[in-house]
Amino acid sequence: MAKKVAGQLKLQVKAGSANPSPPIGPALGQRGINIMEFCKAFNAATQEMEKGMPIPVVITYYQDKSFTFVMKQPPVSYFLKKEAKIQSGSKTPGKGAKAGTLTRAQVQSIAQAKMKDLNAADIEGAMAMIEGSARAMGLEVVG
């Protein structure tokens, strides 16, 4: 017989550095999920990834207090900042202050990496979404 799902929880956790401190501990603890078990499983699953990379994770927890989790790709903003080699986007996007520039080839590589997490029908649609995110961060797309 299948386990009865009690709920789902979405968190964004840095790769390789899940620990019981806030925000992870309280979010899991109030739902009765074993915090240390999640931290160990998540850190083991992300040990090959770049340390500190933000990973969205969807935790499905069951009435018997067990859980499963699915990791997604890092947010588009992470990839954009990494490709443009900047720490943060523009404070005033669209007002003339550019935070950096990206080429269409860089946007396409980000789109290919994020394709399964985006609700785009094809790579062109995914690129359009990513270009919109880039403009919102004050990045200019050239090429």
From Swiss-Prot:
SUPFAM superfamilies: Ribosomal L11/L12e N-terminal domain (SSF54747), Ribosomal protein L11, C-terminal domain (SSF46906)
Annotated InterPro entries: Ribosomal_uL11, Ribosomal_uL11_bac-typ, Ribosomal_uL11_C, Ribosomal_uL11_C_sf, Ribosomal_uL11_N, Ribosomal_uL11_N_sf
Keyword annotations from UniProtKB, A to Z: Methylation, Ribonucleoprotein, Ribosomal protein, RNA-binding, rRNA-binding
GO MF annotation terms: large ribosomal subunit rRNA binding; structural constituent of ribosome
Protein name from the UniProt record: Large ribosomal subunit protein uL11
Assembly description: Part of the ribosomal stalk of the 50S ribosomal subunit. Interacts with L10 and the large rRNA to form the base of the stalk. L10 forms an elongated spine to which L12 dimers bind in a sequential fashion forming a multimeric L10(L12)X complex.
Keyword Cytoplasm annotated: no
Family indicated by similarity: Belongs to the universal ribosomal protein uL11 family.
Modifications after synthesis and translation: One or more lysine residues are methylated.
GO CC annotations on file: cytosolic large ribosomal subunit
Record keyword Ribosomal protein present: yes
GO process annotations (BP): translation
